[in-house]
Amino acid sequence: MNKQLSGFIAILFLTACAVQKPEQIISVEDVGRLIKTLSSDEMEGRGTFTPGIDRAAKFIENEFKQIGLKPLNGDNDFRQDFIVKRIKPQTIQATVNGKIIDQQNLLIISDLPSSGFDQSSGNKLILIAAGDQFIQKYREITAMKTPVLVLVDNQHAQMFKRLKDNSSRGRIVEKQNQSAAAMFILGESDAANYKVSFSNMIEELPLFNVAGMLPGRSKAKELVLISAHYDHLGIVKDVDGDAIANGADDDASGTTAVISLAKYYKKLNNNERTLIFVAFTAEEIGGFGARHFSSLLNPDDVVAMFNIEMIGKESKFGENAAFITGYERSDFGEILQKNLAGTDFKFHPDPYPTQNLFYRSDNAILAALGVPAHTISTDQIDTDKFYHTVNDEFETLEVAIIHATIQAIALSARSIVAGTDTPKRIPKLNSRP
């Protein structure tokens, strides 16, 4: 740790003590212990639906128990169980104008166990032409509620193949759409006569968030969320003898922050608002943990969400700095920065607007419901060569950076936790995500 960073930490805690008089309970050693454990090979990359993520969940549960958090209202423990379904195509057949279509040119997107239709069914026929935006069209079509036949120009063959490969591994859904079926056919431009049929294998799979709380004092009904996702990619393609995507920065670093902040606020024991600490599952495959969590509460009760993602390395702005996604969408960042007055640490607006980071983490699920939900990060995402690789390991991180960022979050959140500041709401979407 260099002198400048050490000096910041000293200033940070002197300032904090002057305001809240907390004990210095977030230590570099404990931060290192947490992140090293969560990103160890024993956790096998914390892949969704694997024994590794179960081991990680048990570790987080035990930390919450030792800290003294309480389960969420109505729960008996810290594990928040729910079920999703994985849908894999088993059989798929199509005949167009008397010609049997090759399997590699067929893609079915449907939650139905099996079905079929032909030109007499009165279903829509849609063309995705050479100049069309394929992904935009794909999203619109798969959101439809009725069966549809889609003819795809060969110009989109590469993206078609990618989607077909993804589908063959299985799509994860929360709820089955019992009426829709989109049959995509590559390389055909006319279908005066057609007949298609398919069948899917559908299996139920368990998922689980880990969540605990510190009940508020005078404003217990007002909730502050402190979150990170604890899943990663699991076992991936072998690279030089290593196939474990440990996910040290993504997002064992954020999960470490959640545990550390829980310990910090439990020790202070003066939060006026209720604090909920949650480690989300399945962020990497679609944000299913955050989606389930958001369905269990009234989003209007959530005052703010501190989502913490990848804080393991120096930011683009140098030491003593992090950025906040969606900074301009509320005054959340301004409140945090105000509370850091007198320290060297600064929260900046997201410097990577083209990366759409605001929409790429669990905060987006709550933000869509009107919550001032933002992600705090230090990652230089445009140049991070370890992101989503087997090399995202503990040894690549700077624990002093993580430690300083966690303490900055602890101090900057104080007025929101105390109930004296309330960030402006974010405009809701028309429907729940």
Model-derived segments and spans:
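Bacterial Sec-dependent N-terminal signal peptides
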Residues: 1-26
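Soluble metallo-hydrolase cores and metallopeptidase-like ectodomains found primarily
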Residues: 165-247, 263, 267-272
